[in-house]
Amino acid sequence: MRPYEIMVILDPTLDECTVGPSLETFLNVVRKDGGAIDKVDIWGRRRLAYEISKHAEGIYVVIDLKAAPATVSELDRQLSLNESVLRTKVMRTDKH
């Protein structure tokens, strides 16, 4: 298991109250494969540096988790298939 941080930018037309429950369906992929979700931090609606899919704003979510590399790539794949996800960024958070 490796520690990861995933930043997800969601469509700003979504209701911010539904962001957490909708992400839970994706995070179940990590739990099924024996990973652990450490923290889900919903930053809320923020202005983007440049437009993505004709949106000037997005709802930012940062997820800290521990999982196998294959599990994280599957989670990233499933997130990218969702139309309400504008962008994802996966980073390993190992301390050297």
Swiss-Prot record:
Give this protein's Gene Ontology molecular function annotations.
small ribosomal subunit rRNA binding; structural constituent of ribosome
Query: GO terms for biological process?
Result: translation
Going by the entry's taxonomy, the superkingdom of the source organism is recorded as: Bacteria
Keywords, A to Z, come to: Ribonucleoprotein, Ribosomal protein, RNA-binding, rRNA-binding
Q: Which InterPro entries match?
A: Ribosomal_bS6, Ribosomal_bS6_CS, Ribosomal_bS6_sf, Ribosomal_S6_plastid/chlpt, Transl_elong_EF1B/ribsomal_bS6
* Database matches in SUPFAM superfamilies: Ribosomal protein S6 (SSF54995)
The protein's name is Small ribosomal subunit protein bS6
Q: Which PANTHER family match?
A: MITOCHONDRIAL 28S RIBOSOMAL PROTEIN S6, SMALL RIBOSOMAL SUBUNIT PROTEIN BS6M
Family according to the record? Belongs to the bacterial ribosomal protein bS6 family.
GO cellular component terms listed in the entry, alphabetical order? cytoplasm; ribonucleoprotein complex; ribosome
Q: Function of this protein?
A: Binds together with bS18 to 16S ribosomal RNA.
Q: Which CDD domains match?
A: bS6
> Which species is this UniProt entry from?
Mycobacterium leprae (strain TN)
Pfam families hit by this protein: Ribosomal_S6
